[in-house]
Amino acid sequence: MLAPIQTIARPVSSILPATGALAAKRTFFAPSEVYNKKQVIVTKKTGLDILNDPKLNKGSAFTADEKDRLGIRGLVPPRPQSLEAQYKRCKTNLDKISDPLEKFIYLNHLQNRNETLYYKMILENFVELAPIIYTPVVGEACQKFHKIFTQTRGMYFSTADRGQMSAVAANWPYDDVDVIVVTDGSRILGLGDLGAGGMQIPIGKLTLYVCGGGINPRNVLPIVLDVGTNNKELLNDPLYLGMQHPRLQGEEFHAFVDEWVSAITDRFPKAVIQFEDFMMPNALDLLLKYKDQICMFNDDIQSTGAITLASVLATMRARGGTFADIKKETFLCLGAGSSGVGVCETIVDCIVAEGATREEAYAQFYMFDHKGLLGKGRDDLLPSQQVFMRKEIEGGKTPAELLKKIKPTCLLGLSTCPKLFNKEMLSYVASYCEKPGIFPLSNPTSRSECTAEEAVEFTDGNLIFASGSPFDPVEWKGKTIQTNQCNNSYSFPGIGLGLVSSRATRVPFETFQVCARVIASLGTPEMLATGKIFPDLDNLRAVSLEVGIEVAKMAERMNIATQFPPKGMDWREWLKHNMWQPEYPHIVVKNL
């Protein structure tokens, strides 16, 4: 059984700075909270090559000495400016843009020009800009990727590269890669097959790794596996940038991924690999195939499971109970894809850890897909879905037909179908359950099973609400009902920080249980009383640090860690030391 949560994490009030610049400005980073160390980058680049490298470029911030040493005197304006002055200029320009996608494009151009300034911008304004750089705006950016594309980022491995993937992997110019996020573009958010346009998802996820987990942006790599697309619109669009043929399937697909995994792990043997937005059953098949071979995990199945489990456990606390009360819950899950199955399996693991048998845990779930209940007579289910089949109830029945029989206490929405949590369902659940968990998790916002306003109105304010996309708090009958974003950004950055800092050799399932329990423990009684179960997203670095510490300790306990804190440091000090800060490095030119 996992350690009681009180022993493995501290409440949010004890991990967030209470005074100083961070408390006043509510940004992600404060010098007093980290071990500041001047970054040094050794390069053989000079002149325009420096200015054209977003990892080295400082724009107008190069000093006179740097201009001489780097051969850029006369190539930039003469008076050097600080990073702070550059940030203020860019923020002023960004604020003039009203359209969310245009804001995304502006930030994309900034990232491709000056990464340090880009991350300074995001970190200073995370709550404002997180919906721009990731959900919901990133969904539109993926759909229009081939229309707004201006500059490449990351790597593409296509069907044209079969038999040559090791050579392709060698083309990446940096030897040190800590985190890779890879997608095949087959199931982008709730938008379906977007092919090569899915590249915006790994780019966005890695921005969150940097901002939330403090991973060095020089050491991240977004990748698309372009195995074709079944999207007819893209197949017929002359501007589409990916391979215009139907997707590889079956053995051909798995042979392609096998070659890529071999090539990429040979090139970057220490990298954590996050699989992202692969359709079922490929997502689960790849997870089961590689989980014990390399340091990898599936974000949709496992990270989503971790943060949803954290939401459920925090709901137990908000009701005045303990984590063990999860054994009494009844779950109605709409959606049986990779995310739906992954979420429910993670919750099952927790129920078992609290003392139930696995069969007893599965019996707490009623899962539905587009054909209705996973029940008796359904012979179309994948093995991963069959364990959730209700053998005593005829398959295909709708949630409305079974609602009064099930009497759920927690609603899980992973269907990508809006408005499925309707008035009848929400009002009925709230009529017999104190603070039912209402979790419409589908992204983007347009696919959410209900809005926060609908959930509050139809439950008369009796609920704990957590959604995949952000919703504002709701004013209801003279009080403010807090909303929560049940977003993977609370989980995977801290997981990555712990795995990278310990150089773990694999990612056991226990990782996500530890993560969930840490996050669920962070809400204070005062927060929980208002319906708020998570710290604000602008405190993500503090949350990620707590998660990372426990993940690193778990790796050490399980003998999968290969790197440890230096003598005189504990894990907390070591992880703080490792967290990257947006400050300009000292650039040393050397013939390598």
UniProtKB/Swiss-Prot annotation:
For molecular function, the Gene Ontology terms on record are: malate dehydrogenase (decarboxylating) (NAD+) activity; malate dehydrogenase (decarboxylating) (NADP+) activity; metal ion binding; NAD binding; oxaloacetate decarboxylase activity
Q: Which residues bind a divalent metal cation?
A: E276, D277, D300
Would you name any one GO CC term? Answer: hydrogenosome
Q: Which residues form the active site?
A: Y134, K205
Instruction: Set out the biological process GO terms recorded for this chain's protein.
Output: malate metabolic process
Catalyses:
(S)-malate + NADP(+) = pyruvate + CO2 + NADPH; oxaloacetate + H(+) = pyruvate + CO2
Q: Where is the transit peptide?
A: 1-27
Q: What does this protein need as cofactor?
A: Mg(2+); Mn(2+)
Q: Where is this site: Important for activity?
A: D300
Co-factor binding comment: Divalent metal cations. Prefers magnesium or manganese.
Q: What is this protein called?
A: Malic enzyme, hydrogenosomal
User: What lineage is on file?
Assistant: Eukaryota, Fungi, Fungi incertae sedis, Chytridiomycota, Chytridiomycota incertae sedis
